[in-house]
Structures are given as structure tokens and as C-alpha cells.
Amino acid sequence: MTTIDLNCDLGESFGAYKMGNDDEILPFVSSINVACGFHAGDPSVMRQTVEKALQHNVAIGAHPGFPDLIGFGRRNMNVSASEVYDYVLYQIGALDAFVKAAGGKMQHVKPHGALYNMAATNPEIADAIAKAIYHSNPNLLLYGLANSEAFIQAAEKYNITLVQEAFADRTYKQDGTLTSRTEENALIKNEDEAIKQVLQMVKEGYVNSVNGEKVEVQAKTICLHGDSEKAVQFAERIYRTFELNGISICAPK
């Protein structure tokens, strides 16, 4: 039976600001990436998100980003590899404390936004992230963009497991990278098209780029975005579609 992980970014609320549909999406995913306070989230939200994830038996991962609350961590920053290492190690440690306090065990780390995209093409950034994971806990998995040589090489260097990731509602360029969110066609807004793309990736191992070329994608986890207007409806549709197609949904080991 084909097996796939469904992951989602949660815990992005902070202070008086509510973001996303965390409670409604949790039943339809197998792993979550929790914001750690730099691009979103705060200590109370981190604790609450961890506790809810454990109640739903969902795997928990840290979602470290750039210290850019105003830009939601989606803006590139001119930072050194050592700064990236510090940012990631700090955020892993913060979330891990809440996970341990709740009696759980953290499973993975997935960089957020601009940090993720920079790491996918910049070996030094990817190396810094992998090193931070290794020094924190070498048993943690690294979620990274499928086919990214930077992620692949960094994971191999530090002997950590890379879980290659694809995106349900994002378009792809010919080189296998995601279309920038600054482009109008970055997101697939039609649910039927997004469902078709996901099934194509999981069952056939490829995706059609924005130019129409087939791009090989051997993903072990699929990312759903939880902050869109119809995020819960979309998550449930993918979940049910996988069930109907005999695809098992579970977190990677």
C-alpha cells in the first residue's frame, strides 16, 4: 500500500491575533510544523498547539523561521550561515521544551518560508540548518523540498534523515523549485486541480511545471496550508481522496 504523510503549519497565532484553523485541520493531518516565535507563534500558543497535537496523536515538528514577524518570515534576509544555525537551534530548543513538558517527543524540523526556500538552493544555509538539527538531536527528521541537492547533501553530511516534501497547492518551475509567492501563478486556487496534482505526485511521482514539463517528484510528505479561507475543506478533501485511492496517511518514521 502507498503511504504518505500529510503535514501542515500550525501554531501561527500570537498575542491577540488568531491565524489559521488549527483545531479543525488537526483531524486530517499526520504531522504538524509548529511556529516557534520568530515569524509567528508565542509561548502560550506553542504549548497549546503541542498539547492538542498529542491529543490527536499527530507527529510534532519545529517550524523555525527568520526573525521577521511583520513579514511572516516570507522575506529573504541577508544573514550568515552561523546566524541561521543560531536561529534554528534556538527555535528547536524552545519547542522541544514544550513537547517534553507535555510528555511527548518531537519528530522533525521543517524550516519556514524564506528560510526554507533559501536553503533549497543555498548549500551553506541548508548546511547550517542540518548542523543545528544534528547538535540538537540527530534523530530528528528534516523536512525539505523534494529534489533539492542542497537539502540532500546537508542531510547526508550530518547523517540525518531527509523527508522529501511536495506541496499540494503550489506550482512548480521546470527545475523543481516552487514558483515564488511574488508570482501570480504561485498558488493553485482550484481545488480540483490541486487534488489532481497531489494524486499525480503520490501515485505517479511527477508534477507538471508551470511550463507544462513533467518534473520528477518523489515525495514522502505533502504540505497543506492551513491559513487559507477554505483550508479545512481542502484538507478533508485530500484526506478522503487518499482513503478512496487506497493511500495510507501516516507520519514518517
Curated annotation (Swiss-Prot):
It comes from the Bacteria. It catalyses: 5-oxo-L-proline + ATP + 2 H2O = L-glutamate + ADP + phosphate + H(+). GO terms for molecular function: 5-oxoprolinase (ATP-hydrolyzing) activity; ATP binding. Its EC number is 3.5.2.9. Transmembrane segments: none annotated. Pfam families: LamB_YcsF. Coiled coil: none annotated. Keywords: ATP-binding, Hydrolase, Nucleotide-binding. GO terms for biological process: carbohydrate metabolic process. Forms a complex composed of PxpA, PxpB and PxpC. Belongs to the LamB/PxpA family. Catalyzes the cleavage of 5-oxoproline to form L-glutamate coupled to the hydrolysis of ATP to ADP and inorganic phosphate. This is 5-oxoprolinase subunit A. The lineage of its organism: Bacteria, Bacillati, Bacillota, Bacilli, Bacillales. The gene is pxpA.
